[in-house]
A protein has these predicted regions:
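C-terminal non-catalytic regions of proteins with extracellular/luminal or membrane-system context
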Residues: 1-249
Length: 249
């Protein structure tokens, strides 16, 4: 096996992609189940499939779980733990023969957002058989000390016709930092189960210490006294995410 892994590309093999294209042409109501351990580039065929299920490596009960999802016995609520790029070039350079590589901050959703590259499927993305709406993002305080915690609440409603679960995600963006920082980073999340039409208040908490960056000059963590934005949404690239500003003093 070549050093560094067993994949030459992030897309499926040409033979697999041709098979998917042929099956989708014969039956537009095709569901594609992908079993893999990391991101897969699907741009060549994703818009042809009726649905795509990312199975990962589900083990011996994976077939039963897959059947439960596609028959509606279970309403899916999983969220991606990584970014699925639209192009392999959007990710950091990868040398299969390297014995060491340094990514620094710039990988995953942090790199794509910095570069203005739209992902195929963002970090934290995942669909359901129902839909959820977000409203009324509120912060308990808009000024925090480094010893405090950011406390946020948001109203989440199941706007569909069946019960479902949503994973509410809170990202924080540092505004005007004196060091290079990611455009935003996930800092908290919460899972909520909702009946059709039900609305619940979801609470999210982030210790101000979690906003720190590591200062190599002092070998310590620093919470900058600057403005920040709390961003609450469905995934890292949610265009409808709610925002509220606060400041660390």
């Amino acid at each position: 096996m070549p050093l560094g892994g067993d994949r030459e590309r992030l897309s499926l093999s040409p033979r697999d992609e041709a098979l998917i294209q042929a099956v989708c042409s014969a039956n537009p109501r095709t569901i594609v189940a992908v079993m893999a351990g990391s991101a897969v580039i699907m741009e060549a065929w994703a818009n042809r499939a009726q649905a795509i299920l990312m199975l990962w490596y589900p083990g011996q009960e994976g077939g039963h779980a897959f059947a439960d999802v596609i028959t509606g016995e279970v309403n899916p609520s999983g969220k991606l733990p990584c970014t699925f790029p639209a192009r392999q070039e959007d990710l950091p350079f990868f040398d299969r023969s390297a014995t060491k590589i340094v990514y620094d901050l710039w990988h995953g959703y942090r790199k794509l957002e910095r570069d203005g590259a739209a992902p195929a499927f963002p970090f934290g993305f995942g669909l359901s058989y129902t839909t959820f709406s977000y409203a009324g993002l509120k912060l308990a305080r808009d000024e925090l000390r480094a010893s405090d915690a950011l406390e946020a609440t948001v109203e989440v409603t199941n706007a569909g016709a069946i019960p479902g679960e949503e994973v509410v995600q809170l990202y924080v963006a540092a505004e005007g930092s004196k060091v290079k920082r990611a455009p935003k980073e996930l800092k908290a999340f919460a899972r909520v189960a909702l009946s059709p039409g039900e609305t619940r208040t979801v609470r999210l908490s982030v210790p101000a210490a979690d906003l720190a960056y590591f200062d190599a000059a002092t070998s310590g963590w620093v919470v900058e006294p600057i403005n920040y934005a709390a961003i609450v949404g469905r995934h890292a690239a949610d265009p409808d995410a709610l925002r509220a500003r606060f400041r660390v003093i």
